[in-house]
Amino acid sequence: MTEQFRYTDERFADIQMLRYRLDGFEALTLRQKLYIYYLAKATLCGRDITTDQFGRYNLRIRKVLEAIYERYEGDRTTVEYKALETYLKRVWFSNGIHHHYGCEKFVPAFTEEYFRQVVDCCGCEDENIDELCKVIFDPTIQPKRVNQKAGDDLVQTSACNYYEGVTQQEAEDFYEAMRDENDPMPISYGLNTTLRKTADGMLKEDVWHEGGLYGDAIKHIIYWLEKAAEVAENELQAKIIGMLVDYYRTGDLRKFDAYSIEWLKEHEGRIDFINGFIEVYGDPLGMKASWEGIVTYKDMVATQRTQTISKNAQWFEDHSPVDPRFRKPQVVGVTANVVCSAMLGGDEYPSTAIGINLPNADWIRARYGSKSITIGNLTHAYNQAAKGNGFLQEFVADEATRALIEKYGDVCDDLHTDLHECLGHGSGQLLAGVSADALGSYGSTIEEARADLFGLYYIADAKLVELGLVPDAEAYKSQYYTYMMNGLLTQLTRIQPGNEIEEAHMRNRALIARWTLEHYPSAVRLVKHEEKTYVEVSDYEQLREAFAKLLAEIQRIKSEGDFEAAKQLVERYAIHVEPKLHEELLARYKSLGIAPVSYTHLTLPTS
């Protein structure tokens, strides 16, 4: 059965759909399956919240397109109809009209005239099609979902729907006035609100809760959460759900923090979930969270790997190559599991994370710890789908390095994710008086770089061989090579010609790889073979020295809240794309006949 399972599915635009398995699901008890079912239903209810957060016109546009898709009785074989169908699929995939990675607005391959024609044929109900046409077809209207270009007003030039009639300076001043530097347990200001300017010029927050904005969707989420609580695996799970429901009803962020602390304590059950306003990557100011949901159950065998890491978290913290002032003196509450994803929703679907570490509040991490997951059935699907596609042959110049990657690549990829989530995000501390938001729009990139560097530094450590996490002292080299290759070259195939790097994880990888290339030319360089560019690593030990040095600086920036240093690193290394190199990489990728690595996953509960 496993050999016959097909991991790849439909492909459109730059998207390759993936399928994944739910191994072990059938072995769960009926009560556990019911628990997953109810949590999954709650996960599906927040979809429209995310779509609306990503742009104020998204829901209206999606509904018109869906009406056409369902009702159109004309010729569905024409080039323009097929283009409209692809556009709709892209809207479904990205939860809106902007690319999920690059944040640029989609360019429709059908005309406005054709769109109006099919709208008329279908009798689509929207009071202002003219307005929607301007948004869809005018490239100057809402060109970017999240704009991070230095010097621009990031709020007014971003299409995301977190602010209304507000400038960047007004938003920053509004939240700065709220902060209390003497509060040891600060809430995540603005996390669950839309900030808008009223008719009289005052700034007002619309809170996302049952009785407020997004209330209809939240009521449905609450309904299914309460059903789930009735069949929870233990009393603490039921209590945690009750606390989450209380937060959803009130929108009180103190209640969200209390819920997060209790959620950290629950690790006896096999099933876990995330449901709420969590990550702030979609806000150019890094404060407001998109809605997301995921339901998981533990992979009991693979979890032994992550538990080994978490049990040794204090050793890793104590031996980190950062200034001792920035280390945690006592690591508490670090738990890590390998899980199977049973359902994804909101900002976790269709393009999803493969690892998660929560909660995000630094003071909760310091006092109570964090939970990390590596989503094993998703990483397995990625790995299986990539086999035999010619990628390594095209981008790795020598056979010895290809053999190294083929031997160790899957193991080291999973392990780096474990280290990134479990130890990287959970490591270090802010100095007293430093705000978690001190790095502003650069914060997400710096945080992801910090976690990646922690993983890169330790994946080469003899401690991992001692713990049995890697088979030998050579394994880490596969991760070092593929990381540098991705950061310098192959991740650029996800970007459209003329665009820059926008997404925080991509910026982080570019920052690390380009900084290392510049500062350690005797360890790594770009070389040409037959007019093709490759990465050549000549000294892997020096690479580790580079990662250690950069980790120390990145941690200093985070701990001290050094905005200017963060800005200089990100602006210099993380954003810009060299056009000729980009053109070459896109052509080479196209020759393979595979889509850039922008995948989705279709849940198939198959054992």
Where are each of the predicted segments found?
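N-terminal-proximal low-complexity accessory segments that begin disordered
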Residues: 3-63
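Long, well-structured alpha-helical subdomains associated
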Residues: 21, 50, 56, 456-557
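An active-site-proximal "capping" alpha-helix that borders the catalytic cofactor pocket
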Residues: 29, 444-460
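Contiguous, non-catalytic segments that form substrate-binding/exosite surfaces or channel walls
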Residues: 88-403, 409
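Short, glycine/acidic-rich hinge or "gate" loops at secondary-structure transitions
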Residues: 235-241, 256, 434-437, 464-481
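Active-site recognition of the HExxH zinc-binding catalytic motif
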Residues: 416-429
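Conserved small/polar residues in nucleotide/adenosyl-binding loops
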Residues: 600-606
